[in-house]
Amino acid sequence: MNKIQMVDLQSQYKNIKSEIDNAVIDVIESGQYINGPAVQEFSLNLAKYMSVKHVIPCANGTDALQVALMALELQPGDEVITTDFTFAATVEVIALLNLKPILIDVDLETFNIDCDKLVKAIGPKTKAIVPVHLFGQPADMEKIMQISKEHNLYVIEDNAQAIGAKYQFKSGIKKKVGTIGDIGTTSFFPSKNLGCFGDGGALFTNNDELAIKIRGIVNHGMYKRYHHDVVGVNSRLDSVQAAILLSLIHI
């Protein structure tokens, strides 16, 4: 009897072994391991797939969430509302930045953030909402965006489990989740919908100003070589992982 695994990474690799091997060898032979052509090409291809203006790759999904909050320039003590049913990373980055996480329960039918409870949780210090699209199912983004507009709040979408999923508005317009709020984030952890062979992540935005901020923050706060204008982090997707993801995105 053969054991059927929920996630079989070895079998996934075997199905596309030659393509992956060639992609990795090309990067190694190029000597361009950080911010090389593979990273730029993957970014452009993912932006096209997501129908979003800017994709900024980073080291992992946790960093993506942290960088998104940093780009919004929230202040210590500001409140960020998110769901209590999510991976720890969603909440830990809020605490790491000396912000206050406000956890609310989920809708029992969708397991996504409960919009009625969300409204009740908004206070004078609330600055942002972080909905989590869980199990490939989008949160109610129409309501969330309406609430954010009424209360002047930022929206950061945690899209680690739903890349590629579409949300349909009442008007009939469809958008990929992760591209609806101010910033979207995702993870390329191996077991994710789109997973690399290590750690990786990305941020999405249609806002040009935020895209510039994010690109600097993920690269030590540099907007010009050796000119560090803001406090940043070292969070770059390496070229090997980008090449692997570039192979996978075409499947």
Give, region by region, the residue ranges found by the protein language model.
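Hydrophobic/aromatic ligand-binding patch that stacks against planar heteroaromatic rings
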Residues: 92-94, 147, 176, 193, ...
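Active-site region of PLP-dependent enzymes
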Residues: 161-173, 180-249
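Phosphate-binding glycine-rich loop
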Residues: 32-79, 93-97, 103-105, 170
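PLP-dependent aminotransferase-like
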Residues: 70-166
